[in-house]
């Protein structure tokens, strides 16, 4: 006891001493730097303090985006304060520090000699790397008057825009886009990228943004995201501006296979008013050219309820976002205001959107089994999906004082939708050593339904500074609630062929199902930070998270299934009267409502409850001095899981611990290095835990697994940035990797009829490594510049494939899958004699190279890219080839005297190494524009894919299967549009005139083999 008391007293004494030391160093020197000519803040300048009589500085700080720098823990005495930044004359002054000193605003005088020496006439792509920010000067990249932000982003080195509209920067997905630091429509970057005119943008900044709580405490919590922050041109401020576009066109020649008509239309509008204190934007968009200008949250929720078994997903193409023809429309308003003398920052937005998607698909899949036999699947089908949604969002930040503030950000989503999917299928088998196929089965499946959903999520953050600089207390609450209802009909007929016609068996499914899924989660995180002196800080944190997911599904069979007949001419099964129509209305048969004859099917019904409780307690130590900052820490994470499935309970508890380590090192003003490590525990989804077969696709039955355990991820990330501001040379590189303990993988097997089954299980550790580097540089003071992007990745994962000796019927009792028996028989699938463990290793290498010539009238870009991929499988039935996806491209953007403009794009794609040879592809887009009415309007005629060669065939190969999938897609079409610009849109810097939204570069990319990543 005495020893414990002595240790406690010693600890108290040490803490008291550290507080006393910290109290003696509370003086600070504050300064704000501004350009003497423009009054703009001078960011990222070096401010230093040199004690009288000393030769070297004792304190350093960099100014932030607002030009402010604070040097903390300054001892009393006389100092020389200096401010330095390339392009400005050095500032120097003598000061005496007795208490904290505020130097106010210091005007930095531009150094004309340096600026003249560093100037490059229209050269290349000016990029500056500042700590965790990559800044692009938008006016250095040629865009047309009608281009959207998405067109500008495609020109930025290191930034990529996917065919689905997603944006990545240096391999990191962009989670949101802000305007001058203010969120634009919260967490939907597509709304900004597809609807904000490129002409109004001054700067594009790619920022590694920490969580709001980490920004306040200064200690990283691992919740980092990559965002894009836009700066608006000064000419667009303090006035109304906008543009409106309308256009129409036609497929050429007429395309009767897309199922959505041959006429093309597009309409878009953007109205904005921006000041230093407020932002207001109104956006409108509608088209049937696959240019959806928003993230379809309602459609995503509907798809998540249906799981992975529906549709034609086994064909490899599925009903994915890049397939088919999409018609979309939306309208929204976004605003933000600085109120009460900048003490309150208020933002709000509303959006309505709708999507109609039409997909046709034909797929063939060959599966190679371990006994030398193979199965050949053929599918032919279509799907129609409609979704509609409303979104409301708000962001409120209020500063009660310099020490106390709150941040509240709620969001609400309401949506509904409906779907119809139909496909015909056949399965043939080829025995080992044989060449002739034998029919296994044939049939069709038809799925219809509708969905209603809503979500409410957000967070509340309270922040408090406690006297000493660096001593803080913050508390954050996150919440997420959702409700999802799905009402559907599942109808199928599968005829399994026997040795004779008398042995043929028809399996009929005629079901109606009602499914409801509710989820609730609340978490709270308390963080306390304490300065320990000499640049050391301590953080203690505690987080509690509770979540509850409840899913109820009731499935009913029709007691009177009726008779199906086969039409030999159309190769279709039919009934004289269907049980239900596509809208879910009851069909009367012989005067009796089918609904009255329904019988509950317990095998496909379920009642599931999942509850999780996670505690996370951690300690972090941080050291910060001059140009280096380091952080180490650890957390202990006990997790309790409770699952109830159809009255049976499953409980599990696990304790994980997570070390963290981070390093920030600013080598100099132009070069920096970052390194991070984080660990995180995650839970299986409700769908993965649901022990109910999904028979939406009768030949591809997916099962859940109530025995799944949480998995733990380890992640490492490093970054390097270099920028030479005189030569406009920029280099950025990152290396990341990680591994997952007990990852969720899949076990799959086939029965004798060719039906595939899949079951999620916890597998052995998986891992991945990714590397990426980009370089951008001009050629001296010429109009040429070059950019290069190189990336590579490696990953390893495991799956399990059932042997031919595995008897599926052993685990079906009265039609129900026996999870207990399966779990007891196969506690470790890797050691089972009924399953093969397949380890997959995949390696990819991609190189992009682009040469740009640019002057005031024309921009010409020539480039190429090549993606090389190779996979290795431990159970491969044949050697896998090295596949190569290659592209050579050229584009021109030419402003012609007289208000004319010419924009052309040409891509040549060729593919090597695929089992099915792929034809070369030539895609040519062309647009002609004319300025009208004192340059306030632009008339545009554009043609997409003029050679009509866009592919709609995709090919994929894996360890034991080969898949080819055909989908409908947009082909060649022409469209005539008129764009009107008004207000301050004509005050922005003059760019090159040309295309508007929906033209070349906006439509769907080629289907083809897997895209180059």
State what each model feature region is.
Residues 27-35, 67, 104-106:
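A short, amphipathic beta-strand motif
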Residues 27, 37-53, 127-129:
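Short, ordered, surface-exposed loop/turn motifs in non-cytosolic proteins
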Residues 295-297, 315-326, 359-367, 375-389, ...:
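Extracellular/periplasm-exposed beta-strand and loop segments of Gram-negative cell-envelope proteins
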Residues 23-24, 66-68, 89, 112, ...:
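Membrane-proximal, glycine/serine-rich, low-complexity loop/turn segments characteristic
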Residues 97-122, 228-231:
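Extracellular beta-sheet/turn segments enriched in Thr/Pro/Gly and aliphatic residues
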Residues 53-56, 78-94:
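A short, solvent-exposed loop/turn motif at the edges and junctions
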Residues 3, 24, 343, 347-351, ...:
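Face-selective signature of the C-terminal outer-membrane beta-barrel domain
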């Amino acid at each position: 006891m005495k020893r414990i008391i002595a240790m406690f007293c010693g600890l108290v004494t040490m803490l008291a001493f550290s507080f006393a030391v910290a109290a003696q160093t509370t003086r600070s020197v504050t300064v704000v730097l501004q350009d003497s000519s423009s009054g703009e803040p001078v960011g990222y300048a070096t401010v230093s303090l040199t004690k009288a009589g000393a030769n070297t500085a004792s304190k350093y700080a960099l100014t932030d985006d607002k030009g402010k720098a604070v040097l903390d823990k300054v001892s009393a005495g006389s100092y020389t304060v200096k401010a330095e930044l390339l392009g400005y004359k050095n500032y120097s002054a003598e000061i005496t520090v007795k208490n904290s000193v505020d130097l106010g605003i210091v005007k930095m005088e531009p150094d004309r000699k340096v600026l003249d020496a560093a100037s490059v006439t229209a050269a290349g792509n000016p990029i500056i790397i500042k700590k965790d920010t990559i800044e692009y000067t938008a006016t250095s990249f040629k865009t047309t008057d009608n281009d959207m932000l998405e067109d500008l982003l495609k020109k930025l080195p290191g930034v990529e825009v996917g065919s689905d509209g997603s944006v990545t920067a240096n391999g990191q997905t962009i989670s949101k886009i802000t305007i001058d630091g203010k969120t634009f429509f919260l967490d939907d970057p597509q709304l900004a990228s597809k609807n904000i005119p490129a002409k109004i943008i001054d700067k594009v900044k790619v920022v590694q943004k920490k969580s709001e709580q980490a920004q306040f405490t200064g200690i990283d919590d691992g919740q980092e995201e990559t965002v894009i922050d836009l700066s608006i041109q000064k000419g667009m401020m303090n006035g109304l501006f906008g543009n409106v576009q309308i256009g129409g066109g036609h497929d050429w020649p007429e395309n009767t296979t897309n199922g959505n008509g041959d006429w093309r239309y597009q309409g878009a509008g953007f109205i904005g008013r921006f000041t230093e204190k407020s932002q207001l934007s109104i956006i409108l968009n509608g088209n049937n050219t696959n240019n959806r200008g928003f993230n379809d949250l309602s459609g995503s929720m509907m798809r998540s309820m249906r799981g992975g078994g529906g549709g034609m997903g086994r064909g490899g193409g599925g009903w994915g976002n890049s397939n088919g023809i999409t018609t979309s429309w939306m309208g929204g308003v976004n605003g933000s205001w600085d109120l009460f003398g900048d003490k309150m920052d208020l933002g709000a937005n509303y959006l309505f959107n709708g999507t109609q998607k039409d997909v046709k698909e034909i797929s063939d899949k060959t599966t190679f089994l371990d006994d030398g036999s193979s199965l050949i699947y053929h599918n032919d089908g279509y799907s129609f999906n409609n979704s509609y949604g409303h979104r409301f969002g708000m962001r409120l930040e209020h500063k009660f004082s310099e020490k106390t503030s709150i941040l509240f950000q709620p969001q609400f989503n309401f949506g509904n939708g409906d779907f119809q999917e139909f496909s015909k299928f056949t399965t043939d088998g080829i025995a080992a050593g044989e060449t002739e196929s034998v029919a296994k089965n044939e049939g069709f499946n038809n799925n219809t339904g509708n969905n209603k959903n809503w979500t409410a999520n957000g967070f509340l953050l309270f922040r408090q500074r406690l006297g000493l600089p660096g001593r803080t207390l913050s508390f954050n609450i996150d919440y997420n609630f959702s409700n999802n209802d799905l009402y559907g009909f599942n109808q199928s007929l599968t005829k399994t062929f026997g040795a004779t016609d008398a042995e043929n068996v028809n399996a009929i499914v005629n079901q109606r199902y009602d499914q409801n899924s509710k989820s609730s989660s609340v978490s709270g995180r308390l963080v306390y930070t304490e300065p320990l002196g000499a640049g050391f800080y301590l953080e203690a944190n505690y987080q509690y998270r509770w979540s509850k997911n409840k899913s109820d599904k009731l499935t009913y069979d029709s007691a009177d299934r009726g008779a199906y007949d086969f039409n030999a001419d159309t190769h279709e099964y039919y009934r004289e009267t269907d049980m239900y129509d596509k809208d879910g209305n009851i069909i009367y048969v012989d005067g009796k409502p089918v609904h009255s004859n329904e019988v509950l099917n317990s095998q496909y019904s379920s009642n599931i409850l999942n509850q999780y409780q996670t505690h996370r307690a951690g300690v972090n130590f941080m050291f910060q001095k001059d140009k280096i900052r380091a952080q180490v820490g650890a957390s202990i994470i006990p997790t309790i899981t409770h699952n109830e499935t159809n009255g049976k309970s499953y409980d599990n508890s696990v304790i994980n611990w997570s070390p963290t380590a981070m390093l920030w090192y600013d080598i100099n003003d132009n070069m920096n290095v970052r390194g991070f490590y984080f660990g995180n525990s995650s839970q299986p989804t409700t769908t993965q835990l649901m022990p109910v077969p999904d028979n939406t696709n009768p030949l591809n039955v997916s099962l859940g697994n109530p025995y799944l355990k949480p998995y733990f991820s380890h992640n490492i990330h490093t970054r390097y940035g270099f920028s030479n501001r005189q030569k406009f040379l920029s280099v950025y590189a990152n290396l990341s990797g990680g591994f997952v303990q007990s990852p969720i993988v899949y076990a799959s097997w086939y029965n004798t009829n060719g039906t595939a089954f899949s079951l999620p299980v916890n597998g052995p550790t998986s891992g991945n490594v990714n590397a990426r580097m980009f370089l951008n540089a001009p050629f001296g003071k010429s109009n040429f510049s070059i950019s290069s992007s190189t990336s590579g990745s490696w990953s390893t994962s495991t799956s399990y494939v059932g042997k031919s000796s595995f008897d599926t019927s052993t685990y079906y009792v009265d039609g129900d899958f026996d999870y207990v028996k399966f779990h007891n028989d196969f506690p470790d699938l890797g050691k089972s004699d009924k399953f093969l463990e397949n380890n997959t290793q995949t390696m990819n290498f991609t190189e992009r190279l682009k040469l740009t010539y640019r002057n005031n009238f024309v921009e010409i870009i020539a480039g190429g890219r090549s993606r090389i991929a190779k996979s290795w499988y431990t159970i491969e039935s044949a050697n896998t080839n090295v596949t190569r996806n290659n592209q050579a491209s050229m584009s021109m953007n030419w402003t012609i005297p007289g208000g004319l403009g010419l924009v052309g794009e040409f891509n040549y794609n060729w593919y090597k190494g695929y089992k099915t040879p792929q034809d070369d592809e030539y895609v040519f887009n062309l647009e002609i524009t004319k300025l009208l009415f004192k340059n306030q309007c632009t008339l545009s005629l554009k043609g997409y894919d003029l050679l009509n060669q866009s592919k709609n065939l995709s090919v994929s190969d894996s360890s034991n299967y080969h898949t080819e999938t055909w989908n409908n897609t947009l082909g060649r079409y022409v469209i005539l549009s008129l764009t009107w610009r008004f207000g301050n849109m004509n005050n922005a810097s003059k760019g090159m005139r040309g295309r508007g939204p929906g033209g070349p570069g906006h439509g769907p990319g080629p289907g083809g083999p897997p895209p180059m990543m």
